[in-house]
């Protein structure tokens, strides 16, 4: 059987985005622009985050947490006693049906006294954590990682803004530590033996899948993953394989970026192939604040006019997450 063609996913040195040299930053911006209008994906290298420590700490957590602890942390979709946990918490595997499992946490600044927590604003939750004695240092590491990847994402948003001909802070002014709705998801795909048939989905083209086609619900997505190729992106000629790189972050636009740019930077349709190997997928979904709204425009037009209507990020996120679950099922 012939192998699937590889997608063009360039490696972009994003380190200039942390500096002051505008000429170098514009080189990065042009590379981001080209990638965003091709396959929609690029690898960010020289990003400044210790991804090996991230991988090791996540593996240690996944292999030490017990079933009882997972249940105690489970989101409402799995544990009905946890009515306030819609996003943050543990997403369980289901024997004979779903092998993947994950732990999701939100902005560490969402404490009980946060105004948006106090007002019970949708999509805002206080994080839940495993017992510190059983998982010493995990919470401290996870919260620090949130801010590390937040900093990288802020730099990437500066690059996207420049790529679109805007001021550097065009996106980052809406991406604030006090109220960003971004999430870290620590996903584990286990090796299975035996393999329950229900764990494998089959696409219309016959490809075996772990997760069906979708667009990301985000402004952009910043993903670290194991060195196990599993993602495919849809292109006019069909689905193409995305090569893995466990030293870099895979970056792509979400559907909010597609909406506000009139699809100038589309959200690439992608899917997860079935690969029976132990691996990690650790996305950071870059989300703005609940009340933030970016006015849509069309970068391809001189006057920028578009018929796209503005939508607040909170409304977008709520509707997008529900639609994704309705389409592909609870993750």
Curated annotation (Swiss-Prot):
Site-annotated residues for Transition state stabilizer: 211
Organism: Penicillium chrysogenum (Penicillium notatum)
Task performed by this protein: Isopenicillin N synthase; part of the gene cluster that mediates the biosynthesis of penicillin, the world's most important antibiotic. IpnA catalyzes the cyclization of the tripeptide N-[(5S)-5-amino-5-carboxypentanoyl]-L-cysteinyl-D-valine (LLD-ACV or ACV) to form isopenicillin N (IPN) that contains the beta-lactam nucleus. The penicillin biosynthesis occurs via 3 enzymatic steps, the first corresponding to the production of the tripeptide N-[(5S)-5-amino-5-carboxypentanoyl]-L-cysteinyl-D-valine (LLD-ACV or ACV) by the NRPS acvA.
Pfam family, one: DIOX_N
Residues that, per the record, bind Fe(2+): 214, 216, 270
SUPFAM superfamilies: Clavaminate synthase-like
Cellular component terms (Gene Ontology): cytosol
Record note on cofactor: Binds 1 Fe(2+) ion per subunit.
GO biological-process terms attached to the record: penicillin biosynthetic process
Subunit structure: Monomer.
E.C. number(s) listed in UniProt: 1.21.3.1
Name this protein carries in UniProt: Isopenicillin N synthase
Cofactor(s), by name: Fe(2+)
Induction data: Expression is repressed by glucose. The transcription factor rfx1 controls penicillin biosynthesis through the regulation of the acvA, ipnA and aatA transcription. Expression is also controlled by the transcription factor pacC that specifically recognizes the 5'-GCCARG-3' sequence in the promoter.
Fe2OG dioxygenase domain mapped to chain residues: 176-288
Compartment list: Cytoplasm, Cytosol
Top enzyme class: oxidoreductase
Record's catalysed reaction(s): N-[(5S)-5-amino-5-carboxypentanoyl]-L-cysteinyl-D-valine + O2 = isopenicillin N + 2 H2O
Alphabetized UniProt keyword annotations: Antibiotic biosynthesis, Cytoplasm, Dioxygenase, Iron, Metal-binding, Oxidoreductase
Pathway this chain belongs to: Antibiotic biosynthesis; penicillin G biosynthesis; penicillin G from L-alpha-aminoadipate and L-cysteine and L-valine: step 2/3
Residues that bind N-[(5S)-5-amino-5-carboxypentanoyl]-L-cysteinyl-D-valine: 87, 91, 183, 189, 214, 216, 281
Residues bound to 2-oxoglutarate: 279
């Amino acid at each position: 059987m012939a192998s699937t063609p590889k997608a063009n996913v360039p490696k972009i040195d994003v380190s200039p985005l942390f500096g002051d040299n505008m000429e170098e930053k514009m080189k990065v911006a042009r590379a981001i622009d080209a990638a965003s209008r091709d396959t929609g994906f690029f690898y960010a290298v020289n990003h400044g985050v210790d991804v090996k420590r991230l991988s090791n700490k996540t593996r240690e957590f996944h292999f030490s947490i017990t079933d009882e602890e997972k249940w105690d942390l489970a989101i409402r979709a799995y544990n009905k006693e946890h009515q306030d946990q819609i996003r943050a918490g543990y997403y369980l595997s289901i024997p004979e049906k779903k092998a993947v499992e994950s732990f999701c946490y939100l902005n560490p600044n969402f404490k009980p006294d946060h105004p948006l927590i106090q007002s019970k604003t949708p999509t805002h939750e206080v994080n839940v954590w495993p017992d510190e004695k059983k998982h010493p240092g995990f919470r401290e590491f996870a919260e620090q990682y949130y801010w590390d990847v937040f900093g990288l994402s802020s730099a990437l948003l500066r690059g996207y803004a420049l790529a679109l001909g805007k001021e550097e802070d065009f996106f980052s002014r809406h991406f604030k530590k006090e109220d960003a709705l971004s999430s870290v998801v620590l996903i584990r795909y286990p090796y299975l033996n035996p393999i329950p048939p229900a764990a494998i989905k089959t696409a219309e083209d016959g490809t075996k899948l772990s997760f069906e086609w979708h667009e990301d619900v985000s402004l952009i997505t910043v993903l670290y993953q194991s060195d196990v190729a599993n993602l495919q992106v849809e292109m006019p000629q069909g689905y193409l394989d995305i090569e893995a790189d466990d030293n870099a972050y895979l970056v792509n636009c979400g559907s909010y970026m597609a909406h506000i740019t009139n699809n100038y930077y589309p959200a690439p349709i992608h899917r997860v192939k079935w690969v029976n190997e132990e691996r990690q997928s650790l996305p950071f979904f870059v989300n703005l604040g609940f009340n933030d709204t970016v006015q849509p425009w069309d970068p391809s037009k001189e006057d920028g006019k578009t018929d796209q209507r503005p939508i607040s990020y909170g409304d977008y996120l709520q509707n997008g997450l529900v639609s994704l679950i309705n389409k592909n099922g609870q993750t």
